[in-house]
Each structure stands twice: as structure tokens, then as C-alpha cells.
Amino acid sequence: MKKILQSIVFKRLSWTVLFLFIYVLGSHLVLPFIDLKHPKLLGGLSNSIAFTSAMMGGNLSSFSLFSVGLSPWMSAMILWQMFSFSKKSGLSKLPIEIQDRRKMYLTFAIALIQSLAVSLSLPIEVGIPKGLAILTNTILLIAGTFFLVWLSDLNSFFGIGGSIVILMASMVANLPRQIGESITRLHIGLPIILSLIIMGLLFLYIAVIVQRARYRIPINKVNIHNRFSQYSYLDVMLTPAGGMPFMYAISLVSIPQYLLILIQILFPKNSWTNTWIEALTVGHPIWLVLYQVVLFVLGIAFAFVNVSGEQIAERMRKSGEYIYNVYPGPDTSRYINKVVMKFAVIGAIYTVIMAGGPMMIVLINPQYLQLSMIPGMFLIYSGMVYNVREEIAAMTLNESYKGLFD
């Protein structure tokens, strides 16, 4: 028992439990000046926005400090990565401190748009100045987003899982309830529920198999005897991007709708905003096309974020490693990028089929939205659990050895 209490996993897990408690506590801190008895609490915000917010650490249905969640930060990270791909921008050459500061500026801009859209849509109590209520709630929502970013950083440093744990907590707390409400609302019988469970387990099995699949590139190390060469290789996942495209695509695609809702509230006479808000609502044809295109693009982009040929080639050159029949340096970088590109396309197609394909059912009935996202959630869950498992395995590696005089 003493050994367990002193283990690094237990200590880090204790910190993570504390951070999750703080997150749950903040999720129950309701924003001020809101008329909770109003029949249309979300105002211009659709239920689909509330649902997608729950997948990114937010909860619009509770009108709490963390209603916007980590969505602005996630959107800022993917936009920054896209900007950094261009060598002409020079963003990747900036000092880390400046990069982090500009990422926070971008996060603030996106958080301002989303928080203002939410605040303007909420019904205000009678007798409260509307301007004061909107300003206060906007500031609180932005502060809530940055607090979650800070909490995620603390969890990365002291706990287990980083921001992944916050997202998992949000999904576990909100999505089962919303899926249950969908089943009740659609009057789905027991046979269909059992079929959905079986299909869900099948999707989970496929997701786990694909998550563990690897392509191994043989690596040779200078001054290492050849009989050890079988243990030297570079792993490339079958889906190098993992489940990240699904999560980030939802965050990225929701930004235009927040922006349009904000324009509609500020300029109610513009008729075109209603048309585009309706077109970009989750489950509509234009949204589905945009979502699947973003899924595919992010599937390729994140593959090169996770497996960078340039960084690996530079690290191999410094450590005296090389790939058989490939010259070190630029040739190694091009070879690795070529391999990654092949699997990135395979992974992007797999992600579109697994996460985007089932959502085509909402064209028949939009009320199937929550159920159609179950396969995508399995992709996220499998990736999250695998990452946490790898992190725990790395932390317990040193503890698996015994001291010489123990």
C-alpha cells in the first residue's frame, strides 16, 4: 500500500482528480443576470451548437463559467499550425515565448467572438441593464476559457493526460445524457438500441485495431552490432493524425456559425445571415460537405504535425542513425514525408468514412445528430485512452526496475 501511495502515477492521478473536481465545480457556477425561466434560453443558438460545445469541454445547456469550453483554444491551435506550415510566414522560427503569446492572442479573438455570440443570445433578467449583463457574461466566458487552458497546462505538468482529461470529462458528463434524450425523443425501441450497442462495439473494435496498427521503417545506428538491428525501427501509425481531426473539425466548423449569429444579433435587418446560419447548421447538406472536407484536410495536416520528416531526419542525423539505402539529411526527410503522406491519405479517408459517413443519416432526420456522432466519439475516446495509457507506461518505466541493494 505504501508503495502505491508513493508511486508517481498515484501522485499525478491525485492532481488530475483535483483538477477534475475544480472543472466540475466551475461547470456549476451559473452566469449572472440570466433569466433561467425563459422558454428559449439559448435564443439564437441552436441545439447543435450546444451539442458540439459539449465535445470541447463546454456546456451551453448549463450557462456556466465554462460554457464556451476549450473550443477557442483548440481552434487557435489548428489555425496556428496551418499558418506555420508556410515557410514565408516565418512563424515557426519565432522564439517559443512569442509563439505562445500570439497563440493566446488568437485564442482571445476567437473566444471573444464565441463568448459575445453566447452572451447576446441569453435572456436577461428584468430590471438588469442589458449592456452590463452582456459585458459581464462575455468577460466571464472568456475568463472561463483561459482558466480551462491554464488548468490543462497544470494537468500536463502535475497530472495525467493534459487537456485530454478535461475534454473526456466534458464528454462523459454531457454526451450520454444528450444521447439518452435523443433515444427517448425518437422513441427508439429495444431491438434498435441493442443493434446500436453492437455496432458501437464493432466501431470501437475497429478503432482500437487501427489505432494500434503500425508501419515500421528499419533504422540502422552507427557502431551498433547488426544483430540488434531487428529492434531498431521508426513507427508510423496507420492513421498518423489519430482522432484529432474529428475533435478539431467540429471546433473549426463551428466558428463561422458563431460569427454569423453575432452579425445577426448586431445587425438584425440583414436577411442573408439567417440563410447562412440555417445552411451552416449541423446536419444540413452544406455543413456536411464542409465538415467532411475539413475532416480530410485535418487528417492530412495533423499527420505531418505528429510525424514531421524534417524533425525526425535532423534528430537521426545528430544521433548517428540512418534508414537503409537512404542518405541522411534531406533525402531521409523526403523519404519519411513520402511514407507519412501515404498513410495520411489512408488515415484521412478512414476518418471521413468512420466519423463523417454515419452523419449522412441526419439528411433524412436531423434528430439523429447525436446518435450519428457516436462512431466519431469512439475515435476520440480510443485515441485519448491510448495516449493516457502510453503516458502512464512511460511514467512507470523507471519504477519497474529494482535498486541494486533493495
UniProtKB/Swiss-Prot annotation:
GO biological process: intracellular protein transmembrane transport; protein targeting
Location within or outside the cell: Cell membrane
Sequence similarity: Belongs to the SecY/SEC61-alpha family. SecY2 subfamily.
Subunit structure of this chain's protein: Component of the accessory SecA2/SecY2 protein translocase complex required to export cell wall proteins. May form heterotrimers with SecE and SecG subunits.
Keywords associated with the record: Cell membrane, Membrane, Protein transport, Translocation, Transmembrane, Transmembrane helix, Transport
Domain of life: Bacteria
Primary localization class, coarse: membrane
Species of provenance: Streptococcus salivarius (strain CCHSS3)
Record function comment: Part of the accessory SecA2/SecY2 system specifically required for export of possible cell wall proteins. The central subunit of a protein translocation channel.
An example Gene Ontology CC term for this record: plasma membrane
Transmembrane segments annotated in the record for this chain: 14-34, 63-83, 108-128, 131-151, 156-176, 190-210, 246-266, 285-305, 344-364, 368-388
Membrane topology designation: Multi-pass membrane protein
InterPro entries: SecY/SEC61-alpha, SecY2, SecY_dom_sf
Gene: secY2
Name by which UniProt lists this protein: Accessory Sec system protein translocase subunit SecY2
